[in-house]
């Protein structure tokens, strides 16, 4: 059926773009080859989407079952019976076998759950497993922690599903843009002007075939935005360069950077003076603009650094606060902050270490909380740290409601930050939506030029 559709599409393109049979054969061979790559990318998208849905069902079933049974092995058995046949069920079966058949290890459950974590790289799975392992070994009230994890998971699921829908919608728009550009390019060849037909021109034929090739490659590129790993799409970078961004921002020295900017501005300033002296005013204006940019490059760079840093911090802070909220269920705030360093986003690592050091010196003071990330002056973070301090001192004797409010605000912050990050990651699809316009415009310009030349030749004759 696929090959019949390709033959039909090729014949339509042959008629629409007035392709000769040689170019038609080239287009047919190209489309037959490319359909293999399109099929592979389509399958990868379906697999990535299924992996996400499997993980979503796994976390839900696991946590609800653990709340009911309060035993890891029983929770996993319930998950296995719920899942449909597939890779996730096979992985859960291997984890259960490890639990049942291993007798010489002290952390059997942890090692068994790591089997699933290695197959599905997802922070929500790790958080659920760590919560279950802690509850299994140490006991305690698990309802509140499970509720936090389930709320976070539900918000995460909604974000990713919404992002998948956005990507599919934008991909369909790319296809529509391609179809429209090809149709418009074909219409030009049917303009009834003096019976002039430029379609037989070799340049027009080559450009028509090239248009089809480029537009198909645009569609293939668009498919790359669909086949991403949706389990890790919202993960933050963990490299050393990312870890040092906050320290580099704090180390900014305006006086030193100004001196560097002045040195950079000397050459374009001298060039501007020389151009004015030689009465070349427009080049002099361009040189003046370059000098002004060089003179202010340190300010521009610092503002861009702050903008990017704020975006990263707004994504990292709610993730750290979520881990903190889980730890607070069984620890006091100061101990929870110390333990949270194990999974903290790298961009906050040094700042949290500084917070711990300040709390060691002033455990009852609000100053360490208020000085956290004070260099960025973000109201939402300041408010969250103020609430955290109130919880630490047990203000008003109602810590439960304060923690609930903290979690609610944190989930809102996380939703806004991650939604913005996911939207930024699909920005390239908008450029692909515009790409067929560029290819079609170029072909139309060349076609009109050839038409004009043919028209003038016709008039001369």
Positions of predicted regions on the chain:
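Bilayer-spanning, highly hydrophobic alpha-helical transmembrane segments
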Residues: 3-9, 151, 157-220, 264-270, ...
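Long, mid-chain structured domain cores
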Residues: 19-24, 28, 45, 86-90, ...
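Alpha-helical transmembrane segments and their immediate juxtamembrane interface regions
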Residues: 204-229, 284-316, 381, 391, ...
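Long, solvent-exposed extracytoplasmic domains/loops
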Residues: 87-133, 146, 351-359, 365, ...
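Hydrophobic alpha-helical segments characteristic of transmembrane helices
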Residues: 60-79, 117-166, 174, 226-241, ...
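Membrane-interfacial helix-loop-helix connectors in multipass membrane proteins
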Residues: 17, 108-117, 188-207, 277-283, ...
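Junction motif at the cytosolic side of a transmembrane helix
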Residues: 219-250, 300-305, 452-458
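Juxtamembrane/interface alpha-helical elements of multi-pass membrane proteins
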Residues: 22-107, 237-256, 269-272, 276-359
């Amino acid at each position: 059926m696929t090959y019949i559709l390709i033959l039909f599409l090729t014949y339509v393109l042959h008629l629409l773009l007035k392709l000769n049979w040689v170019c038609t054969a080239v287009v047919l061979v190209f489309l037959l080859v490319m359909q293999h790559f399109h099929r592979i990318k389509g399958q990868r998208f379906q697999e990535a989407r299924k992996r996400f849905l499997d993980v979503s069902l796994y976390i839900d079933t696991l946590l609800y079952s653990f709340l009911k049974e309060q035993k890891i092995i029983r929770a996993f058995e319930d998950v296995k019976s719920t899942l449909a046949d597939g890779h996730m069920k096979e992985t859960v079966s291997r984890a259960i076998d490890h639990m049942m058949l291993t007798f010489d290890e002290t952390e059997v459950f942890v090692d068994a759950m790591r089997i699933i974590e290695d197959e599905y790289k997802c922070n929500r799975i790790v958080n659920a497993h760590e919560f279950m392992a802690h509850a299994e070994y140490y006991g305690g009230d698990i309802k509140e922690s499970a509720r936090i994890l389930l709320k976070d998971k539900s918000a995460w699921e909604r974000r990713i599903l919404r992002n998948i829908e956005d990507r599919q919608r934008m991909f369909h728009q790319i296809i529509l843009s391609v179809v429209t550009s090809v149709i418009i390019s074909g219409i030009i060849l049917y303009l009834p002007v003096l019976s002039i037909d430029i379609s037989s021109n070799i340049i027009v034929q080559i450009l028509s075939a090239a248009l089809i090739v480029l537009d198909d490659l645009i569609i293939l590129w668009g498919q790359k935005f669909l086949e991403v790993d949706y389990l890790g799409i919202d993960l933050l970078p963990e490299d050393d360069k990312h870890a040092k961004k906050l320290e580099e921002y704090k180390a900014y020295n305006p006086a030193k950077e100004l001196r560097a900017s002045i040195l950079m501005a000397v050459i374009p300033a001298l060039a501007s003076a020389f151009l004015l002296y030689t009465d070349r005013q427009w080049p002099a204006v361009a040189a003046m603009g370059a000098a002004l940019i060089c003179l202010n490059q340190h300010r521009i760079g610092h503002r861009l650094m702050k903008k990017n840093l704020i975006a990263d911090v707004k994504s990292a802070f709610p993730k750290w606060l979520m881990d903190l909220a889980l730890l607070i269920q069984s620890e006091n705030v100061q101990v929870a902050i110390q333990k949270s360093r194990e999974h903290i986003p790298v961009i906050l690592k040094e700042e949290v270490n500084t917070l711990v050091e300040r709390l060691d010196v002033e455990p009852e003071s609000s100053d360490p909380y208020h000085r956290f990330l004070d260099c960025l002056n973000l109201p939402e973070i300041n408010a969250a740290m103020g609430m955290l301090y109130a919880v630490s001192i047990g203000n008003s004797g109602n810590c439960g409601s304060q923690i609930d409010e903290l979690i609610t605000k944190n989930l809102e912050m996380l939703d806004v930050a991650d939604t913005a990050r996911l939207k930024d990651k699909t920005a390239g699809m908008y450029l692909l939506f515009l790409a067929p316009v560029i290819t079609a415009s170029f072909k139309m310009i060349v076609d009109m030029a050839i038409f004009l030349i043919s028209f003038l030749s016709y008039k001369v004759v």
